[in-house]
Design a protein with these regions (language model features):
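Active-site-flanking beta-strand signature of metal-NTP-handling nucleotidyl enzymes
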Residues: 2-9, 62
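Beta-propeller fold detector
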Residues: 40-42
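Short, surface-exposed ligand-recognition loops at beta-strand->loop->(often short) alpha-helix junctions
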Residues: 11-19
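Carbohydrate-binding/catalytic loop surfaces
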Residues: 44-52
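A general structural signal for well-ordered alpha-helical packing
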Residues: 3, 20-23
Length: 116
């Protein structure tokens, strides 16, 4: 499984509730066309804890999406870049509300695990 962490800030004057609504619609559309396995809700950073040690990045908002494999990840990227579907229009509306966006992907490993 591949995971994608999106970290970002909302531009000044943008409405969090509108972003959440668009994000939920975006996920519904991506699930309907099998472009993601699952995704978590949008969230806010909890930086006033010793567990948050990242001083290099200041983003305050996050989301996490999960993809079956590299093929699904790449297909989702191509789908969004095509800008031809309702979900891609929603993605563009969301992206225009963001600033300081950074995306990080990683893949699960099965080292030391029996996969039979």
């Amino acid at each position: 499984m591949i995971h994608m962490l999106s970290s970002f800030d909302l531009k000044p004057g943008e409405d969090w509730k509108v972003l959440v609504c668009d994000y939920d619609n975006f996920l519904t559309n991506l699930r309907a066309v099998d472009m993601i396995i699952d995704a978590g809700p949008l969230g806010h950073r909890v930086e006033d804890t010793p567990m948050d040690t990242d001083k290099a990045r200041t983003q305050s908002c996050f989301s996490l999406m999960r993809f079956r494999d590299r093929a699904q990840l790449d297909a989702a990227y191509a789908y969004i870049q095509a800008n031809t579907q309702p979900s891609t229009a929603t993605h563009l509306r969301m992206y225009r509300r963001l600033t300081n966006a950074v995306f990080l992907c990683w893949e699960d490993t099965n080292l030391g695990k029996d996969t039979t």
